[in-house]
């Protein structure tokens, strides 16, 4: 979908474990609407889906096509292994860093930071590499370096949401962004 290849399929053609963009249409197919969610089928009899993210929330600055489900799974695996508690996080590309290769910047507001933070960061990268083969290839071939975790002060994400007029329970900060707008704002709150 991100590459501009649009192929409609019916339920009889879906595969368990593959991400799809959910399109709602009339029974005649005369019109259709992209609701903006990505889904994955977890069962075909009966049909069961999980929402894996939003179409507009992805990172593909280097061709990696990282989606919300992949970063959430990687972070959950790290928290289960190393402990800690996260209030919120977001990931964005750093295309032109001052030093070294481009990379993904993770901005995390911890409620409780893991005790072994350096191992946490290494395992986070390893977990994401297991989730996404394109990201793994880019890191393995030194096109980009492993991800960088930036800890931000308590209240940083609320400050960002307030700055864009969306503070409140009905709004969430995007987990992924293909630009630096959120990352640049949160860079002012680094610990």
Q: Model-derived features: where do they sit?
A:
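Active-site glycine/GP-rich loop and adjacent strand/helix microenvironment
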Residues: 1-191
């Amino acid at each position: 979908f991100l590459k501009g290849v649009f192929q409609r399929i019916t339920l009889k053609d879906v595969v368990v474990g593959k991400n799809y963009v959910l399109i709602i249409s009339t029974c005649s197919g005369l019109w259709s609407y992209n609701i903006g969610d990505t889904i994955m089928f977890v069962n075909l009899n009966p049909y069961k889906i999980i929402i894996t993210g939003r179409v507009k929330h992805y990172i593909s600055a280097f061709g990696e096509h990282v989606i919300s489900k992949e970063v959430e799974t990687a972070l959950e695996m790290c928290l289960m292994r190393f402990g800690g508690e996260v209030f919120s996080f977001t990931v964005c590309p750093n295309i032109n860093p001052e030093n070294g290769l481009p990379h993904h910047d993770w901005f995390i507001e911890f409620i409780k930071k893991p005790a072994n933070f350096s191992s946490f960061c290494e395992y986070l990268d390893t977990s994401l590499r297991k989730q996404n083969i394109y990201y793994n290839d880019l890191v393995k071939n030194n096109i980009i370096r492993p991800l960088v975790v930036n800890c931000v002060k308590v209240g940083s994400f609320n400050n960002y949401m307030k700055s864009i007029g969306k503070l409140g329970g009905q709004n969430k900060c995007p987990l992924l962004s293909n630009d630096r707008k959120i990352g640049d704002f949160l860079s002012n709150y680094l610990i």
